Amino acid sequence: MVSNHENELNQGSAAEAPAPNTAQEWPEDGKETVDACPLCGGVERSVVHPTLTDRIFFCAPGVWSLYRCKTCHCGYLDPRPTPQTIGLAYAEYYTHAAPQDEVFLSSATFVGRRLAVLRNGYLNARFPNLGLQPAHPLGSRLMGLFPATRALAERDVRHLPTPEPGARLLDIGCGSGAFVSRALSLGYAAEGLEFDAKAVLAALGGGLPVRHGALPDTGLDSDSYDVITLSQVIEHLHEPMAALQEIFRLLKPGGVFWLATPNMDAPGHVQFGPDWRGLEPPRHLVLVSPQALALALERSGFAQIEFKSPGAVSEWFHRASYRIANNAKPGADIALPKHLAKLARREDRDSLNKPVVGEELVVMARKPR
């Protein structure tokens, strides 16, 4: 969800955003209390943001509180919408749109266009059947000069290796299927699973192999997939631990799990506080810290847990957060102040060597053989 992170509403003008839907309350019988941390079960906690509202899509009513677990340091809403009513928060969600190929790097500037050509050449060398154009034939060599851009290119193909013949990939929470389409072009026997019926219809309309279903009860066969990816999904789940255990069950022995999610400990969260784009209440029910995510994966049975650099994503998060802080419309073309742009660039550089300091956490793990 990072490059072309989402097709946010009303793009273009920097006019004032609509007011959050606080006049209408979330149905009281549609809330549930959270007595313990959804990841580690800890009960000691502290309040981080007591009065959050939906300032992304402006469709979810209510005011929400985010707490931080004192044991694993993840964040979670309490109370939160019930599984039966959470759909109220997705009335205007971006996955309802028809699937489109992901835009990996901006081509709006001269530099962006040149980097996109290098990136295409780099990925074509990684995946011989990909055929991205325009592409520079020396992209695989020259991309070493642009490590943050190379890291973003790797993130956008989810750090996947060239597939063995017949390798099966499942993208869970695939939306309208953009990455399913990309994985097919990479050479995987790819399919998607999506809980949003409107998004499934959009994917099927695009001819993509996407079925309706959700974690943790997928109904799929055990030991079935070589790769499972979960991009910007775990933060939406009521039962994140059960979801990780289900993914472990679905993977073949030796199979790879790839996950991306906002980082509760991100510098942008420190900088912007309740305006940080990664919060997105009440759709984001849980926000993991590096410590919480590693512990949850270990407890679910995974091994070879490795955090990856998210690449040059910080400016996107900072710009989106700055829009929220300034009450601008979602997607508005608003300039990021120089000091914030500098902070974002430094964060991207730092995340190349220490991946857990980025706006996103990106991690790969394996099911032991």
Where are these regions (language model features)?
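Conserved SAM-binding loop
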Residues: 3, 12, 21-38, 45, ...
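Short secondary-structure boundary/capping segments
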Residues: 57-58, 161, 200-201, 277, ...
